[in-house]
Amino acid sequence: MADNKKSMSRAISEDSNLYNKISGTKRAYSDLHHSNSSIYSAKSFGSSVTIYCAVGNDQQTALVNQNDQFYKNQFMIRASSYPTLVSPVSTENQLSQQLRPHISEAAEVLHQYIAKRSRKN
């Protein structure tokens, strides 16, 4: 499982197009985690934002890091947004292709969340 997790992380983090989907000018990386449902996280460095999106259920959790303060476990529900990943994924390229649209949508949700949070502060 650990090797599989590293392989999936590498598949996403080495794809510069996926970097750009998550964070336009900041260097970003993604990681894929397995639990009862498949969950991946999109993280960017610096004062950017971390988002955890559930793939295969309707829950997304965004962790926002602004001015070095974390706003933890802000839940956003979007039913049926993320179809279940096909598994097992036999190659890194297959994984990358499957996750590309999800990361793109996650980035959009993330920008909306940041804008909302900024208006409140």
Curated annotation (Swiss-Prot):
It comes from the Viruses. This is Uncharacterized protein D2. It comes from Microplitis demolitor bracovirus (isolate Webb) (MdBV).
